[in-house]
Amino acid sequence: MNEPMTVILASRNAGKIRELGELLSTYDIHVLGLDSFPGIGDIEETGRTFEENALLKAQTVTQLTGHICIADDSGLEVDALDGAPGIHSARYADDWHSLDGESRDERNMRKLLSVLSKLPDAPRSARFVCCMAAVKPDFLEGRDLVVRGTWEGSILD
């Protein structure tokens, strides 16, 4: 009997790792997260697009582990802000002070609504973008894969 293939998810989010593990277990694929590799620190996202950041993370982890890696990058693009916050979504309001008990997500939303309130006639169209990359070690045949999905919507007050 063959051992299951191991795939690394470039994340420390236990929920994401568990969910992907459940999906891929049907195919005899074992999923590990970055916590299984304590020598891998945070990977700096230096890309200019969601695709570049996802690919950068997957390539880095594959080089360090020798395993196939899946990585993602995601965020919000607001048309009235020329696509901002974009790849900076998670850190959008890091330059704003936190209110008592306010989470980073809440602070990001507060900043976004404040910026949009100064543009009362601007459209509120926006989209959530998620890009995923799968990278294989050099010794495996096939090409790396990058995909992009979007969910269109509007920003409400």
What is the predicted role of each segment?
Residues 2-8, 14-33, 38-157:
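Anionic-ligand binding patches
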